[in-house]
């Protein structure tokens, strides 16, 4: 959120300026000689949110990948107990650690937060 600062003496807007000698951020008035130190060295922050899918990279032959861990969690669709799992590919602050399971029988994708029986990893 952007906030504006105003001069205490003449009420004009203050502009950011770098104090190169002391390596700090200042706000100064262009009308009078008023200068104040910034509370934070941050002028602007731009957070990028990527819109990749949580299951990005899931392909038809995911079960043949020997690097993926296996589980015997029951598939809610076909009740098979053969699946592989991986963590969400989203890297955001508000994303919790959710495991995605891919059933090797029917390719159904389900998550660890669904109400299923306890998972035993192999």
Swiss-Prot record:
It comes from Saccharomyces cerevisiae (strain ATCC 204508 / S288c) (Baker's yeast). This is DNA-directed RNA polymerase II subunit RPB9. The keyword Endoplasmic reticulum does not apply. Zn(2+) 1 binds at residues 7, 10, 29, 32. One of its GO terms (biological process) is maintenance of transcriptional fidelity during transcription elongation by RNA polymerase II. A zinc finger (C4-type) spans 7-32. InterPro entries: DNA-dir_RNA_pol-M_15_CS (IPR019761), Rpa12/Rpb9/Rpc10/TFS (IPR012164), Zn_ribbon_RPB9 (IPR001529), Zn_ribbon_RPB9_C (IPR034012), Znf_TFIIS (IPR001222). Zn(2+) 2 binds at residues 75, 78, 103, 106. The modification Phosphoserine is found at residue 40. CDD domains: Zn-ribbon_RPB9 (cd10508). Component of the RNA polymerase II (Pol II) complex consisting of 12 subunits.
């Amino acid at each position: 959120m952007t906030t504006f600062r105003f001069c205490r003496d003449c009420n004009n807007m203050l502009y950011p300026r770098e104090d190169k000698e002391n390596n700090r951020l200042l706000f100064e008035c262009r009308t009078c000689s008023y200068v104040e130190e910034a509370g934070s060295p941050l002028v602007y922050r731009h957070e990028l949110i990527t819109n990749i899918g949580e299951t990005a990279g899931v392909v038809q032959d995911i079960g043949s990948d020997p690097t993926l861990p296996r589980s015997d969690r029951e598939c809610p669709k076909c009740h098979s107990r053969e699946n592989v799992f991986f963590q969400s590919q989203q890297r955001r602050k508000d994303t919790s650690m959710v495991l995605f399971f891919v059933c090797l029988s029917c390719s159904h994708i389900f998550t660890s937060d669904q109400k299923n029986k306890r998972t035993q990893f192999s």
